[in-house]
Amino acid sequence: MTNTKYYPEVSSNADFATIEKEILKFWQDNNIFQKSIDIREGDAEFIFYDGPPFANGLPHYGHLLTGFIKDVYARYQTVRGKKVERRFGWDCHGLPAEMQSEKELGISGHLAITNFGIEKFNAHCRDSVMKYAGEWEQYVTRQARWVDFKNSYKTMDKNFMESVLWAFKELYNKGLLYESMRVMPYSWACETPLSNFETRLDNSYRERADKAVTVSFVLCHPVSKSTLDVIPWLDHGIQKTINNDSANCSMDPVDKPRYDTENFLGITANYKEYRILAWTTTTWTLPSNLALAVGSDIDYALVPKGDVCYIIAASSVSKYAKELELKGDEQFTIIKGSELQGLSYKPLFDYFKNHPNSFKIFAGDFVVEGDGTGVVHMAPGFGEDDQILCESKGIKLVCPVDNSGKFTKEIPDLEGLQVFDANDKIIIKLKEQGNWLKTEQYIHNYPHCWRTDTPLIYKAVPSWYVKVTEFKDRMVELNQQINWIPTHVKDNLFGKWLENARDWSISRNRFWGTPLPVWKSDDPKYPRIDVYGSIEELEKDFGVKITDLHRPFIDELTRANPDDPTGKSTMRRIEDVFDCWFESGSMPYGQAHYPFENKQWFEEHFPADFIVEYSAQTRGWFYTLMVLSTALFDRPPFLNCICHGVILDATGQKLSKRLNNYADPLELFDKYGSDALRVTMLSSNVVKGQELLIDKDGKMVFDTLRLFIKPIWNAYHFFTMYVNADHIKGELNFTSENVLDVYILSKLKIAVEKIKESLDSFDTGTAYHAVSEFFEVLNNWYIRRSRARFWKSEKDADKQSAYNTLYTCLETMAIAMSSLVPLISEAIYLGLYCHPRKSGDPEKPECLDSRLCGNDNLSVHLCDYPDLSKFKINSELVDTMDTVLDICSHSLFIRSSENARVRQPLSSITIISKNNDKLKSFEDLIKDEINVKSVIYRDDLENYAVKKLSINFPLLGKRLPAKMKDIIAASKKNEWEVTSGSLIICNETLNSDEYKLILEPHSHIKGASSFAHNSSLLILDLELTPELIDEGIARDIVRFIQQARKNADFAITDRILIDINLPKITDIYGEFIKEQTLGEFAKDFIPDHISEIELDNHKLQLKIKKVN
């Protein structure tokens, strides 16, 4: 007999954070991550793209969530036999870096940066952009995520940037790029336009209060026969002008008509003026007004007030009752918006009064009734719809606002004033002129800059665009090849975004980014555009060696215009740089420096098998990947994609440093470990796109530790404690004659298979549930029901089989769940495989497994996923034993409900079921587990219970709203039937998720509960005899003694002396108590431990002593 302890001493109160740190060190010291890649060399690959974060800020819980998901599937595919490279990447260019540098340098704005020096500014950006790279590596490593930092790509690297240039030229050559002056979302704080999808990122829309104004425009129109022919309703009340004063109306330089100062829209009365009312929430755009838009089919009312007639949408009249002095019983002449088309009006201001073709009313299909007056004021320099309509009518846009959002000298009254600060001054002027009618507070969702949180404006800016609208239908087609999680993203969140995709502005008038490779002639007499797609092309044309593609070095490259015979004009690069989202979308080929290098590698690694980010990236990274992949390669960029939700605080607020509503993740790791946070996040619905609320104090993570991690560890602790006490070594064994062994090994296969199916389907929630469910059965059924086998002194085949079975469960699950809880799985696996040498030196582990890796180091992450063919499953046993567990579980629930403690024996349980024959073979087990003296079997269910129909009203109501009243009435009368497994009510067949059949015991029956999915009933006899009460006390005494042993820190094998003054109980149940506690009753000994206990309101003293 050997006294070797083959396994480490494991504490039941493990410090998981410390254990995790030891495992992290083991991985680092033994290069386990790299080995996990090397051992798969030559195997099929699982292609994973790691979306690049910015490193100029610390990681937050959102980053950790994404990282956990990435790590789970990379690890899982590795143990499934795939090679998974995990190259990290960094986003380096763009606004995040520039804003940070401006802040640190104490400068702001284009002019300040230019004066500071572009070279110095970009040098600072280059240094600051990787400011927190070290911290990122610390967080990522501590969360047990394996990534290749050493070979990480950076979007600011010359090779990556050159691939971006190549992509641009490819698009240009395909005719998919154009330059245009268009209205775009514009960040005046950053002095740059934004893409339309950037306004959809990170909840950029937020509530804002603006002053909405209603202003009146004085109509005027030439008096002529042609006018009356076009607008016949004018003829009802025309008044010829007496004083035809042109100074009171504008002149149209094109048609050069002379306008009347009086208007002629009267029907039955003569009016001095006709005024049309327009409503706007952007008062600051009124100085740039050039036209008005109405809805052709909208009804407009002619509303008189004194000698002025106002025109307003009929549906909006009541909102202006006070301003228009209405009583409520007036009748108004109604005209269609189409009858207003072509009318002219007097400009509000003189700034652009001579602008060609302007100050007319047009029909716009975007004009709707609702807010406002049914009339839209048009400022084509500040509205997309405005620009499109006005340009179609020959009206060129004006844009008297500079890059910093301030009025230019074209509006001298407001020059230098920020547009939002100008609203009050404009309102004052409108009042002075008599054009103001109403100001109101308007609360609406308004887009804000995703970097500065300042409200955006819409402003016409020159930009280069990708013609996304030209191939958006193809993107929609390719999207059908992608598996989205959750599934609704494919056709809704992402699919609809693709269907409505607009051309993408990819140029930014900024500094720190990949420069657009476009050179133009500086003389419009000799126009020429050159686009470059490689460093070689640049070096050839400009004759210099290029070492840095950034500004200002690239700006200095000039050459004579080849198309200028005079030789005077010069080719100069346009100042713009790329939208950084273009670079992110270029990641698949940019990281490989394609097509200049690694062409075969890229072709073998595109598209990705898997990517993951949070749901807003359907407008960001996922979208730009899709645009560029479709345009360049006509392929989807990825095949499987998880869109997870967002992490919020316990009250539903966004996590914020300002609000101080979340803890530093490292503090949480040091307290509970990272596996606990991984499980908390990935077992929730946040992986399926929903929100996860997490408390600052980490209670949720602690609960995960207690309810998920601890049960796993408890099973491992139990095994090592007992197997070391017996000096036995566990072995893998998938067969046994013992019914409990066969059952748990069958459940093991089911769990391992479920984990595999779930992770193959990118469903971590179900995978974690399978782990938790298995350990629940392992701990609370298999181990507990097998305790006698582990406790007995004989080291027979049955004991060895029990150890082998438990060992097999632990090792197999350690591998199967290694991606889900990588650190704890590793700790358990190493404990099972790296045993102390027989010499007893615990400092020199010996690997006893045949799957040795270099330097004799093992890791669970170097294993293959468990081979399911090794398992045998007894389905009939599983079904029956699961029913037994169900009976026991419901019995415990009844005891709890009736305050009948578990250790109190009961006389009987009655089981009413059609499957009693299978249950009878487990009768002794049921009696022992439920703590009853007998089991009574019956099959006449109808005498004890009735089946009731419970309908899922919200779900069924959506499908059958018209029949719900009849269905509710029929269900209350039990007028339904089950035919061939289908439930029919009111001639409708219900789906399985639309109802439940509940077994309801008759009202006079106590201690009853349904089980086996409401198909059977059990009844506990809760009446107690004096004998049953005494036996319950004996069982309580056993519990008290076991707790005293634990408190005294006795080993599980220590025999003890017991002294308790309860002769009536010890005389009858003494042998039972001694057997259960390894004790003997004695008096007059010096105790090692004394406990005060309470039984039936009597206080007793319990003394125990360890026997040498």
Swiss-Prot record:
Q: Return the motif ranges for 'KMSKS' region.
A: 654-658
Which Gene Ontology cellular-component terms appear in the entry? cytoplasm
Residues bound to ATP are 657
Kindly list the biological process annotations in GO that this record carries.
isoleucyl-tRNA aminoacylation
Tell me the compartments it is located in: Cytoplasm
Provide a Gene Ontology MF annotation, just one: tRNA binding
Q: Which UniProt keywords apply?
A: Aminoacyl-tRNA synthetase, ATP-binding, Cytoplasm, Ligase, Metal-binding, Nucleotide-binding, Protein biosynthesis, Zinc
- Keyword match Aminoacyl-tRNA synthetase: yes
Asked whether the UniProt record includes Magnesium among its keywords, one would answer: no
Q: Which cofactor does it need?
A: Zn(2+)
Superkingdom, taxonomy of origin: Bacteria
Pfam families (UniProt xref): Anticodon_1 (PF08264), DUF5915 (PF19302), tRNA-synt_1 (PF00133)
What is the reaction catalyzed?
A: tRNA(Ile) + L-isoleucine + ATP = L-isoleucyl-tRNA(Ile) + AMP + diphosphate
- Enzyme Commission code: 6.1.1.5
NCBIfam families recorded? ileS, RPE4
UniProt-listed PANTHER family = ISOLEUCINE--TRNA LIGASE, CYTOPLASMIC, SOLEUCYL-TRNA SYNTHETASE
Q: What is known of its domains?
A: IleRS has two distinct active sites: one for aminoacylation and one for editing. The misactivated valine is translocated from the active site to the editing site, which sterically excludes the correctly activated isoleucine. The single editing site contains two valyl binding pockets, one specific for each substrate (Val-AMP or Val-tRNA(Ile)).
Indicate what this protein is called per its UniProt record. Isoleucine--tRNA ligase
> Where does this protein come from, organism-wise?
Rickettsia bellii (strain RML369-C)
**Phylogenetic classification of the source organism:** Bacteria, Pseudomonadati, Pseudomonadota, Alphaproteobacteria, Rickettsiales
The coding gene here is ileS
